């Protein structure tokens, strides 16, 4: 669902017609089912709108950095989508190191993440939309599942749905978004 939400944010920003728009995806490690679902959701949503996924890179942020720099030179894109927090931070670092952002003028960044750094750059306008997983709730769900397994001696694990918010610069300071971004302060 998070991937589909990113695709919808891109479609909304570009008027649902992405024909001819070139997209690059930083897909994180695809060994986790949740990451596979994010990738499937975003790539299907973009293709249905006419966008061309020029390339996608799989792996952890540090391991794909060199490949990204090469691809960015050989196959520049109009839209960058980072499916994980570290990958979104890597893109922000990439933009920051570029003579004050000529790439920002021709490339829109969308990502998943909740770090202070990503929220700061969303507020600054470098990230167009950030999908923010409710990590506080995710931790609660995990502890609840562990407690039930210990109490009832269950061996099975099941998937849980993680809630998330789609945040753009305009709505960053809305009360419901602030509760998710800064749960301890509340």
Language-model segments: which ranges?
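Hydrophobic alpha-helical segments within soluble ligand-binding/sensing domains
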Residues: 1-20, 65, 113-118, 133-151
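Short, solvent-exposed amphipathic alpha-helices that sit
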Residues: 2-6, 33-51, 90, 94
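Sec-exported extracytoplasmic/periplasmic mature domains
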Residues: 8-16, 43, 47, 69-76, ...
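Loop/turn elements at helix/coil->beta-strand transitions in domains of secreted/extracellular proteins
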Residues: 19-22, 47-53, 75-79, 104-108, ...
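Short beta-strand segments enriched in small/hydrophobic residues
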Residues: 21-31
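Short beta-strand elements in bilobed, periplasmic/extracellular small-molecule ligand-binding domains
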Residues: 23-25, 42-62
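Hydrophobic alpha-helical
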Residues: 42, 59-119
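Hinge/cleft segment of the Venus flytrap/periplasmic-binding protein
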Residues: 134-186
């Amino acid at each position: 669902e998070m991937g589909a939400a990113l695709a919808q944010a891109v479609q909304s920003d570009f008027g649902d017609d992405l024909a001819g728009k070139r997209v690059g995806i930083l897909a994180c490690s695809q060994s986790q089912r949740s990451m596979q679902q994010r990738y499937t959701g975003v790539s299907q949503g973009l293709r249905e709108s006419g966008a061309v996924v020029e390339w996608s890179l799989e792996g952890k942020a540090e391991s794909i950095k060199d490949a990204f720099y090469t691809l960015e030179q050989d196959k520049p894109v109009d839209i960058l989508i980072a499916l994980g927090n570290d990958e979104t931070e890597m893109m922000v670092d990439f933009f920051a190191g570029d003579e004050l952002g000529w790439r920002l003028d021709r490339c829109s960044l969308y990502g998943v993440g909740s770090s202070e750094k990503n929220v700061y750059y969303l507020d600054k306008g470098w990230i167009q939309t950030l999908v923010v997983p409710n990590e506080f709730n995710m931790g609660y769900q995990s502890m609840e599942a562990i407690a039930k397994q210990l109490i009832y001696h269950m061996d099975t694990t099941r998937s849980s749905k993680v809630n998330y918010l789609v945040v753009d610069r305009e709505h960053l300071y809305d009360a419901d978004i602030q509760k998710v971004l800064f749960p301890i302060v509340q």
